[in-house]
Amino acid sequence: MVEREKKRQKLVLKGKLSDTRLHNRCWRCGRPRGYIRDFGLCRICFREMAHQGLLPGVVKASW
């Protein structure tokens, strides 16, 4: 995620940093799509970590 920080600093210097220009990315793999905001993960990493029991309070839905 070093590249993301470099890009952010570059935008700050140019005065072009705004919330709409920043794209949410998964903190684990950097994937920009399928982002789950509450966890900061993409759907794939969220699923893997939930199956491994690494996300406290997350249970598989059953109805």
UniProtKB/Swiss-Prot annotation:
InterPro entries from the UniProt entry: Ribosomal_uS14, Ribosomal_uS14_bact, Ribosomal_uS14_CS, Ribosomal_uS14_sf
Keywords: Metal-binding, Ribonucleoprotein, Ribosomal protein, RNA-binding, rRNA-binding, Zinc
GO cellular component, one term: cytoplasm
Annotated Gene3D superfamilies: 30s Ribosomal Protein S14, Chain N
Domain of life from the UniProt record: Bacteria
Intrachain disulfide bonds: none
One BP term from GO: translation
Cofactor: Zn(2+)
Xref: PROSITE patterns: RIBOSOMAL_S14
Binding site for Zn(2+): C26, C29, C42, C45
GO molecular function, one term: zinc ion binding
Note on cofactor: Binds 1 zinc ion per subunit.
Family from the record: Belongs to the universal ribosomal protein uS14 family. Zinc-binding uS14 subfamily.
Function: Binds 16S rRNA, required for the assembly of 30S particles and may also be responsible for determining the conformation of the 16S rRNA at the A site.
Assembly: Part of the 30S ribosomal subunit. Contacts proteins S3 and S10.
HAMAP family assigned: Ribosomal_uS14_2_B
Name under which the protein is recorded: Small ribosomal subunit protein uS14
Primary gene name: rpsZ
